[in-house]
UniProtKB/Swiss-Prot annotation:
Role played: The glycine cleavage system catalyzes the degradation of glycine.
Organism: Serratia proteamaculans (strain 568)
EC numbers, comma separated: 2.1.2.10
GO CC list: cytosol; glycine cleavage complex
Name the UniProt record assigns to this protein: Aminomethyltransferase
Top-level division of the source organism's lineage: Bacteria
EC top class named in words: transferase
Family label: Belongs to the GcvT family.
Oligomer and partners: The glycine cleavage system is composed of four proteins: P, T, L and H.
SUPFAM superfamilies attached to this UniProt entry: Aminomethyltransferase beta-barrel domain, Folate-binding domain
Cleavable signal peptide: none
Length: 365
């Protein structure tokens, strides 16, 4: 039996088509995925992300523990509330999960991890936390709502108390603050400004209804996927998993190689991969008719005349751009053009950096 978030009845009342998403009944769309996508790019939309797992870590050695557990380095987090994005790797350098970690106090950090990886994440964290005396608290008492879009902050602020408005004033991206009952973070998965707000489950229905009244449009998993794809953001299980190196998933920037004496899980394997070379994640654009779909083959010929093949990890029509885009994992040496096999047709595609739209503006020519 699939689980329900506290907002399940609200989704049904809004006309959602509900689907099983990694064991959770979640809204795919509320009638029009395209309209929901445009609402987030042009105005303000909201997502129920209560299926994600919030984990609080406490203990005197929490920072030391996270410096070992994560590929990025929480030593960078010196200002309370500051967050960073990181991979959590296995010993062979594969990605167990990608997550956000918040520094709250010297003995208190918060992680937000994916729903699909919840059980293995918790088991892995608990196993490695024990020697450090770090205590885990899974915050199943909290719901999580993402409010995203150019008008998102303004609309959300109409629900805030004076204390909460003051707490978020001038807050830069990738920060979080506890203000009253709300944990308000300037993070998201859309390439737009906005907040991800954690609050007690018993308050979330009222909060959702007030956001609706403020003109924030509900958006489902379908729009969430096209928005994150346009923004060039990875989806766990597609761009990366335990068999894929972060170096092959456009996550090299999340690996803190310095200081050289910091040992973290997967470091030794990553150093070998970096020396040997890995596949890479690229963006693809196809302006001709047709749609780039997951798992389609991508072929190119390198400068030496050798033919290579990769695979599309995520592909879709881009509502913002009006043509098809994709992320693809390919061997090194790809140039500016490639071929994608769509049924019996070989379609030319342009190769770009991963990332096509940010803050409503195209990044591509």
């Amino acid at each position: 039996m699939a689980k329900q978030t506290p907002l399940y009845d609200q989704h049904v009342a809004c006309g959602a088509r509900m689907v099983d998403f990694h064991g959770w009944m979640m809204p795919l769309h509320y009638g029009s995925q395209i309209d929901e996508h445009h609402a987030v790019r042009q105005d303000a939309g909201m997502f129920d992300v209560s299926h994600m797992t919030i984990v609080d870590l406490r203990g005197a050695r929490t920072r030391e523990f996270l410096r070992y557990l994560l590929a990025n380095d929480v030593a960078k987090l010196t200002q309370p509330g500051k967050a960073l994005y990181t991979g959590m790797l296995n010993a062979s350098g594969g990605v167990i999960d990608d997550l956000i970690v918040y520094f709250l106090t010297e003995d208190y950090f918060r992680l937000v991890v994916n729903s699909a990886t919840r059980e293995k994440d918790l088991a892995w964290i608990e196993e490695h936390a024990a020697p450090y005396g770090v205590a885990l608290t899974v915050r199943d008492d909290l719901a999580l709502v993402a409010v995203q879009g150019p008008q998102a902050k303004e609309r959300a602020a109409t629900l805030f108390t004076p204390e909460q408005k003051s707490a978020v004033e001038g807050m830069k991206p990738f920060f979080g603050v506890q203000a009253g009952d709300l944990f308000i973070a300037t993070t998201g998965y859309t390439g737009e400004a906005g907040y991800e707000i954690a609050l007690p489950k018993e308050q979330v229905v009222d909060f959702w209804q007030k956001l609706l009244a403020a003109g924030v449009k509900p958006a489902g998993l379908g729009a969430r996927d096209t928005l994150r794809l346009e923004a060039g953001m990875n989806l766990y299980g597609q761009e990366m998993d335990e068999g894929v190196s972060p170096l092959a998933a456009n996550m090299g920037w999340t690996i803190a190689w310095l200081p050289e004496d910091r040992q973290f899980i997967g470091r030794e394997a990553l150093e070998k991969q970096r020396e040997m070379g890995t596949e890479q994640l690229v963006g693809l654009i196809m302006t001709e008719k047709g749609v780039l779909r997951n798992e389609l083959p991508v072929r190119f010929t390198d400068e030496a005349g050798q033919t290579h093949e990769g695979i599309i990890t995520s592909g879709s029509f881009s509502p913002t751009l009006g043509f098809s885009i994709a992320l693809a994992r390919v061997p090194a040496g790809i140039g500016e053009q490639a071929i994608v096999q769509i049924r019996n047709r070989e379609m030319p595609v342009k190769v770009t950096k991963p990332g096509f739209v940010r803050a409503g503006k195209p990044l591509t020519n």
